[in-house]
Amino acid sequence: EDVIIINSAPNKKLRWEKTQSVNAGFDFSVLNQAINLSVDYYYRKGTDLIALRMLPLETGFTSMNVNWASMENKGVEISLSTRNITTKNFSWYTNFNFAYNGNKVLQENIPEQQTTPGREGYPVGAIFALKTAGVNKETGNMMFYNPEGEKVTLKELYRLKDEWGIGIASSDVTAAEERTFYSYIGSSDAPYTGGLINTFSYKNWELNVNFSLTFGGYVRTQPSYDIINPDYGKNYNADVLNRWTPENPNAELPAFMLSASNPEEYSWYDSKTIWRDLDIWVKKLNYVRLQNLRLGYRIPELLTKRLGMNSATVSIEGRNLFVFGSGYNNYMDPESMYNPYATPVPKSVTFSLNLNF
């Protein structure tokens, strides 16, 4: 039988969202434009954003889309270009740009039954995680910090009980209380980005070196292995070698868990997203990428004229050749850490010949 389910109440009074913005900046140039500096500041506040608003249960609905949420964005963008050296046969130019971009959710509603914190007061890309306290060297189980800062087991944190003795855990922890178990780690949107381009010219040769910079962001990675029901025929991240075993009691990652040895925690890991919510899977996103490296040679005009051409240039170019960073060990690229199956940023080397007649 066909049925229609209405998940949220309709709202015919929805209207356009509002934005207030302020921009300021200045440009600075000295030494016959050998040094050029540009600084821009912006502030944007969005109000009447469409978001869910919880409703009294007597309305028959739990939530409705309403114009009521708000968010602010602010940042500074700096651009600096310099003419470092210019002689008859050699020149060196530099372009540097840097930006800080931050945002904050000012008003947001979350369902009462939601067990993870809301983003109000935090960035849109806020990452919250359960604060771990290392691995118990005797049992191999993960330890946690409770809201009071005490080291506890998962069973103690959630007050787990197997009331029927059948290996299914229950807890009297409320959703509001569970939200206090989580700590704010950072934002998935890196607040600091930039780029550095150096161009060197010597006679007919030209070398371009382009770096991109990303700092201050975080990424929630997929767990390196399954703590319960591990598939021994599956390819895992090399981090699995750093899990607890009797021969490796000082490991940083917990042991595989068996239902017979710890039925309450096993059941809780199995029925919840606790394992993926641990802070050990949140990595810093700080890296510098050699985005472009190009070496070109302009064939002398005397030769091109003899060949019936106006100009000719030969070059070799490499893209995304190197990444310098921390926190992405055992991952192919920091930009694809969130998904072990994602295609990393490709590296390429190309050769080109440009002829103009």
For the regions a language model picked out, list residue spans one by one.
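Glycine-rich, aromatic-lined ligand/substrate-binding cores of catalytic
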Residues: 185-222
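Extracellular/periplasmic, surface-exposed regions of secreted and cell-surface proteins
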Residues: 1-129, 277-357
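Active/binding-pocket-proximal capping segment
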Residues: 42-47, 56-58, 213-217, 224-228
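Extracytoplasmic gating/loop element in the C-terminal half of outer-membrane beta-barrel translocons
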Residues: 215-313, 318
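Active-site-adjacent bridging/hinge elements
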Residues: 1-3, 50-54, 75, 167-176, ...
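Conserved small-residue
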Residues: 66, 76, 83-187, 228, ...
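N-terminal hydrophobic signal/anchor transmembrane helix of membrane proteins
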Residues: 34-38, 76, 192, 216, ...
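Flexible glycine/proline-enriched surface loops and loop-helix/loop-strand junctions
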Residues: 6-8, 179, 191
